C-alpha cells in the first residue's frame, strides 16, 4: 500500500510499446472519442480490468463452493454498480461483465455524453465546453471531461446557468442546431 497523500498512476502502459494493431486501435479510439492522448484510453482499460478481475473472483468463489450468501452479495454489488453507471442493462449477468468493451466505458464519459446529446458539434468541442465550465449536471458545474456519468445523471446534463451558451440566440448554439438537423 502506498502513501495515501501521494498521487499514483491510474493506468498501466502496454507491455509491447510498438504493437501495430494496438496502436491503430488506440488511435481510432482517441479520434472517435476526442481524447487528449492514449493515456485516457489506458485509464478506461484499467477500469474495465478492475471490473473483470472482480467478476473472475466471483466466478472462482462460486466454483469453490464458498458461502453462497457472500458470493451473491458480491455479485449483486458489482452488477448493481455497473447498472447504476449505465454500463449494464437491468437483466445483466456476471458473463456480461466479462464481455464489457472499452467503448462502453468511454461512452459513459461526460465528454462523450455531451457530444452525443447534441450540446456540441464535435467531441473536441464538447471537451472544450466542459473544461471552460459551460456544462452542468443537475445544476452543478462539472469541469472534468473524464467524469463518469451515471444513468441517473445522464438526463440532468445541461448548459451551466452562468454560461452564455444558455441563451438560444447564442451564435454557437445556432451552429450546433444546424449540424444537428
Swiss-Prot record:
InterPro entries: Ribosomal_uS4, Ribosomal_uS4_arc, Ribosomal_uS4_CS, Ribosomal_uS4_euk/arc, Ribosomal_uS4_N, S4_RNA-bd, S4_RNA-bd_sf. Gene3D superfamilies: RNA-binding S4 domain. Residues 108-172 form the S4 RNA-binding domain. GO terms for biological process: ribosomal small subunit biogenesis; translation. Keywords: Ribonucleoprotein, Ribosomal protein, RNA-binding, rRNA-binding. The keyword Ribonucleoprotein applies. GO terms for cellular component: small ribosomal subunit. GO terms for molecular function: rRNA binding; structural constituent of ribosome. Pfam families: S4. HAMAP family: Ribosomal_uS4_A. One of the primary rRNA binding proteins, it binds directly to 16S rRNA where it nucleates assembly of the body of the 30S subunit. With S5 and S12 plays an important role in translational accuracy. Part of the 30S ribosomal subunit. Contacts protein S5. The interaction surface between S4 and S5 is involved in control of translational fidelity. This is Small ribosomal subunit protein uS4. The gene is rps4.
Amino acid at each position: 500500500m502506498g502513501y495515501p497523500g501521494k498521487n499514483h498512476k491510474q493506468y498501466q502502459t502496454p507491455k509491447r510499446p510498438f504493437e501495430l494493431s494496438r496502436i491503430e486501435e488506440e488511435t481510432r479510439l482517441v479520434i472517435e472519442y476526442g481524447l487528449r492522448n492514449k493515456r485516457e484510453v489506458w485509464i478506461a482499460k484499467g477500469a474495465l480490468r478492475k471490473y473483470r478481475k472482480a467478476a473472475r473472483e466471483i466466478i472462482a468463489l462460486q466454483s469453490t463452493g464458498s458461502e453462497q450468501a457472500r458470493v451473491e452479495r458480491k455479485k449483486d454489488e458489482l452488477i448493481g454498480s455497473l447498472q447504476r453507471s449505465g454500463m449494464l442493462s437491468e437483466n445483466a449477468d456476471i458473463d456480461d461483465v466479462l464481455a464489457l468493451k472499452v467503448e462502453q466505458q468511454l461512452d459513459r464519459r461526460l465528454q462523450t455524453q455531451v457530444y452525443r446529446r447534441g450540446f456540441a458539434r464535435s467531441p473536441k468541442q464538447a471537451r472544450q465546453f466542459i473544461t471552460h465550465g459551460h456544462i452542468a449536471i443537475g445544476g452543478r458545474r462539472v469541469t472534468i471531461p473524464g467524469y463518469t456519468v451515471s444513468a441517473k445523471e445522464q438526463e440532468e446534463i445541461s448548459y451551466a446557468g452562468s454560461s452564455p451558451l444558455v441563451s438560444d440566440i447564442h451564435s454557437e448554439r445556432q451552429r450546433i442546431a444546424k449540424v444537428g438537423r
